[in-house]
Amino acid sequence: ESSSVQAAIDIYGLSDLNQIDSGYPEEIKKLHESEGSPEALWVNGPSLNGEHNADGRKKFSEANPINYIDKAIPPFLLMHGDADKSVSPDQTKILHEALIKAGANSTRYVVKNAEHGGIYWAQPKVNKIIIEFLNGVLKK
């Protein structure tokens, strides 16, 4: 049996760090421009020299999952909450559109009122979507 990845599930994940604040109001966009923002810490590590997002765009591009999509990619299930204030729901939309453009199988759900984590992600409806996706892909 193959050990290659046969299915992928992305729940409120990042896809393009250069557009991390897409769809957010200005006050949230400003938070993403700081050297202490989660994405700046993820890519640059703790900043001792004042490097932040505006300085690290090349690093951000190299870390973007959308830059590594090819035709051999497995089916994707993308889920995001429309009330997520940590990662913009546009992130799964960007990835979904890039996957479709590359000819991959991608399904995206937006969960109403769901934030980044929390009780909304433990709903039976969400679990059912995930189980049905995995059964549909892995039990063929």
Language-model regions, residue ranges each:
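Primarily recognizes the serine-hydrolase "nucleophile elbow" in alpha/beta-hydrolase
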Residues: 1-27, 136
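Short beta-strand/loop motif that positions the catalytic acidic residue
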Residues: 72, 77-80, 84
